[in-house]
Curated annotation (Swiss-Prot):
Keywords, alphabetical: Cell cycle, Cell division, Centromere, Chromosome, Meiosis, Mitosis, Nucleus
Region entry Disordered, spans: 122-158, 224-316
Compositionally biased spans, kind Low complexity: 288-304
Coiled coil start-end: none
Compositionally biased intervals (Polar residues): 133-149, 262-287
Intracellular or extracellular location(s): Nucleus; Chromosome, Centromere
Subunit and interaction comment: Component of a monopolin-like complex composed of pcs1 and mde4. The complex associates with the kinetochore.
Name of this protein: Monopolin complex subunit mde4
GO CC annotation, single: chromosome, centromeric core domain
Other remarks in the entry: Transcription is induced by mei4 transcription factor.
Secreted is among the record's keywords: no
Function: The monopolin-like pcs1/mde4 complex is essential for accurate chromosome segregation during mitosis and meiosis II. May clamp together microtubule binding sites on the same kinetochore, preventing merotelic attachment of microtubules.
């Protein structure tokens, strides 16, 4: 029988060893699987972060391109403005030339009129008493005089016609230049409207991408916090559940279950999802984009206590008795000191004191204070206030220095006299 019992004991020991070894192997493989899952999650986070960086790089390139286009459009605008200025200068030059030609034409017309008047005077005043010879001579002389005047008049008319043609051509050129200037102004206004639209589009795109980047950063921050908490929990579990095949008695499943129940769940609380509307409102107010969370280091550093209040807030019965006795001894003396100080204080104005702040004094006899006190009629509105009698002059503090009081008295005496200038 003893041999049978020893054999069964040895078999049971072997079975226990095999079971514990298998359990340790299973736990080891589970920890490896958890590590792999964490690595996969970190890889996915890195990929998402790289994608966000690529998107931001593409956005920055687009912004640079847009800025280059804006610069090109601005240069075009400047060139158009320069062309407009040149054309305006040319138009002004043409106008000056036209004005000069008009002045010349007016001068020529005046000369022609003067010549015509001279000819009429010469024709209207021939001498009647002269002989026919003299008349013929006069006619010959007039012919000789009028022939060059006629040629001069013809030359003047030709010059005037030429000047009129030049003026007409210049006016046509001015009209064409004015039309070109109007076209250029309309083109410049259209370009300016396009620039304004383009700037508005750029600003909207920039604001949208900024909001998206902030949302991605907040999500990445929350995921990093989750990963840190999960890593800490896995490290604790790995410390508690470490594979020890050599000594089976070191590992106790009951302790593991107890510690597993006490461990806080790091990933129980899901973070708040940040929407674009909340993001815009938070940025306009000046708040942070990510939700406020306590750091995992601070949570892990705090000790776990079942009590609701810390040990420093609890008071033992002996301490309570000592405090009660100390308060009973100190309160009456403090009250007497306060009353004494209130007696010595100068009374404040009723506007600065509320009914709750006015100190209550005992009623005094009027024999001592009749000569010093002044009785005033109280209004119905202020009748609810407590009665405050002014203290005597002996109890008042000396608030005015003697020199100042003397100067005030001298000034009051001086007011009665007038100085003659």
């Amino acid at each position: 029988m003893s041999t049978i019992s020893t054999s069964t004991d040895s078999k049971l020991d072997n079975l226990g060893l095999s079971v514990t070894s298998r359990r340790n192997q299973i736990l080891f493989y589970l920890s490896k699987a958890l590590n792999l899952a964490h690595l996969l999650r970190s890889d996915s986070l890195q990929k998402s972060f790289l994608d966000a960086l690529k998107q931001s790089a593409t956005d920055s390139e687009l912004l640079h391109k847009n800025l280059d286009e804006i610069k090109f459009l601005q240069n075009e605008k400047l060139n158009n403005e320069k062309l407009l200025e040149q054309e305006q200068n040319e138009a002004n030059d043409y106008r000056l030339k036209v004005e000069r030609l008009e002045h010349k034409i007016s001068d020529y017309v005046q000369e022609i009129n003067s010549l015509n008047s001279q000819l009429q005077i010469q024709k209207s005043n021939p001498e009647k008493h002269e002989d026919a010879v003299s008349q013929n001579r006069l006619r010959g002389s007039l012919d000789t005089v009028s022939s060059p005047s006629k040629t001069h008049k013809a030359n003047k008319d030709e010059k005037a016609t030429r000047l009129h043609l030049i003026i007409a051509n210049l006016k046509k050129a001015l009209k064409e230049k004015d039309a070109e200037v109007l076209n250029l102004q309309s083109h410049v206004s259209s370009k300016e409207s396009e620039l304004d639209r383009f700037k508005i589009k750029l600003e909207t795109e920039e604001s949208n991408w900024k909001v998206r980047l902030q949302v991605l950063e907040s999500k990445l921050a929350t995921q990093d916090r989750k990963l840190r908490m999960q890593k800490k929990s896995t490290e604790r579990k790995s410390l508690l559940v470490s594979p020890r095949v050599s000594s089976p008695k070191l590992f106790s499943p009951s302790k593991q279950a107890i510690m597993g129940t006490r461990q806080p769940n790091a990933t129980s609380g899901s973070p708040l999802s940040v929407t674009p509307f909340l993001q815009k409102t938070s940025t306009s107010i000046g708040l942070s984009s990510s939700p406020p969370q306590s750091s995992p280091s601070a949570q892990s550093s705090q000790p776990f206590s079942r009590d609701k209040y810390p040990h420093s807030m609890t008071v033992s019965p002996s301490n309570a008795r000592y405090l009660k006795k100390h308060l009973d001894d100190t309160i009456p003396s403090n009250v007497s000191d306060i009353n004494h100080n209130d007696h010595l204080k100068i009374p404040q104005s009723p506007s600065s004191l509320s009914p709750s702040k006015i100190p209550i004094r005992k009623k005094r006899k009027l024999k001592d204070t009749v000569s010093n006190c002044e009785f005033t009629e109280e209004d119905s509105e202020s009748s609810f206030l407590l009665e405050t009698i002014q203290p005597t002059k002996s109890t008042l503090r000396r608030s005015i220095s003697p020199l100042k009081k003397r100067n005030d008295e001298i000034n009051e005496l001086k007011k009665g006299f007038t100085m003659k200038k």
